[in-house]
Amino acid sequence: MDLGALLDELESGDQELVQKSLAEYNQENSQCFFFNAEQREERKKLGELVISFLNRDLQPSCQIACLETIRILSRDKYALSPFTGRSAIQTLAQYAGLDYSEEMEMPCIPDGESAVEALKGLCNIIYNSVEAQEVAKDLRLVCGLARRLKLYNETRSSHESKFFDLRLLFLLTALSVDMRRQLAQELRGVSLLTDALESTLALKWSDIYEVVTDHLAPPLGKEETERVMEILKALFNITFDISRREVDEEEAALYRHLAAILRHCLLRQSDGEDRTEEFHGHTVNLLVNLPLMCLDVLLTPKVEQGSVEYMGMNMDTVEVLLQFLHRRLDRGHKLREMLTPVLNLLTESSRVHRETRKFLRAKVLPPLRDVKNRPEVGNTLRNKLVRLMTHVDTDVKHCAAEFLFVLCKENVSRFVKYTGYGNAAGLLAARGLLAGGRGEGCYSEDDDTDTEEYREAKANINPVTGRVEEKQPNPMDGMTEEQKEYEAMKLVNMFDKLSREQIIQPMGVTSDGRLGPLDEAAQKMLQRQESSDLDSDSD
């Protein structure tokens, strides 16, 4: 469809002709997501005419054609100016049924194709334009969406209508701090979205914080999964700072209720492995945000036939999280995005729940038998996590090390035993534990159990590599004392030269257990020695 001819027809104002021409243009460009720069001004002009045309009294078919055109044009972030002004956003909000006023007693519940197309256009525009985000805030679109969400269970709206309501809510709260705060505080968004989540999943409760989970139920349908994931994403946006502040009893009850629903989500499958993985990924992301004190509900359900039991506790959820970690480790891409949430969740849960820590330790760090290979060599979960401890991404490296350190109850010697000093050095240096000892966590005093294989090989294990090394011949065998002294001085001079030319900087462990320049470390040791000598003299 020639853009020039289309513009002429729009300017003519003939509704039937406009509808026919726009329908043809929409069909030709339905799969167009990249636009050439040459016709940008013509597309802007088309956008202005279409948004203006929508303010007329139009037949439904013409409304739909205009809104479809806006959806297509709004994919081009360089030609959005016709749609980002207050008037244009307000027009689209009216078609979507989101125009908000305090006097409005009931929200508009549109369910036609026009409303869905308007929502799609708004999603594109809000996503691509900061100006549009500000207008959406001024027009209180979040309030309109929240009002509609309150009737989520009572309306028979189509899947598309509900889905794009939720998608728009996610985008508004992701892109605007003010709208995020408004939904969370003024509109009680956590409660609102939790109710929508519960409704979509059609939950039944056996106890206050225990959902009835039918393990023989069919997988969650595609449409329900899509809506659930949008709800989880919106909840993530408005809860990301909760774990950093104190919550009162009412809030704690709300978050425990939500955690119980998220437990159910982890135990449900969706239609296909990839969709289930995505569904569980959003669930894990949200669980990380919740206060740790509220995650006890993950372990409270009664042990039933087929449940994973440990120390009398139901470990179904922890087992699912462990399998989820396995799969993400094997994928090996986008490690920060894929791994850090689940590693953080397992780490913090292990800190506060003894049963979780002991169960995970039995799975991840079973009694050590393989002392011939380096800790990072192999395909066990321990091997894969130890490999991550020297990853180039600092966040990934830290999360993997912290998880294993907590499973070792923050005991340095135990941590080194399972990972090797070379792999452990980064975390120990950051924690000031290079000289040994243990971290600040409070743990029970049960002992580590050494296998017979480990006890027999312990004396020959190289603590740096974490394995038994073959004995190497002593390079000084056969040397006279003069030759040894000569080689030693030669080595000292080489290090001295490298140090003076600032090619290397010799480091040592300081009194606070961290790495520091060797001269500083030596100076502090000398000062301590002098202080000790003075104390001895005074006696």
UniProtKB/Swiss-Prot annotation:
Q: Which GO terms describe its biological process?
A: G protein-coupled receptor signaling pathway
Which compartments does it reside in? Cytoplasm, Cell cortex; Cytoplasm
Q: Name one GO molecular function term.
A: G-protein alpha-subunit binding
Question: Which keywords label this protein?
Answer: Chaperone, Cytoplasm, Guanine-nucleotide releasing factor
Which segments carry the region annotation Disordered? 506-539
Superkingdom classification of source:
Eukaryota
Q: Does the keyword Chaperone apply?
A: yes
Q: Which GO terms describe its cellular component?
A: cell cortex; cytoplasm; plasma membrane
UniProt similarity note: Belongs to the synembryn family.
> What is the stated purpose of this protein?
Chaperone that specifically binds and folds nascent G alpha proteins prior to G protein heterotrimer formation, promoting their stability and activity: folds GNAI1, GNAO1, GNA13 and GNAQ. Does not fold G(s) G-alpha proteins GNAS nor GNAL. Also acts as a guanine nucleotide exchange factor (GEF) for G alpha proteins by stimulating exchange of bound GDP for free GTP.
Q: What is this protein called?
A: Chaperone Ric-8A
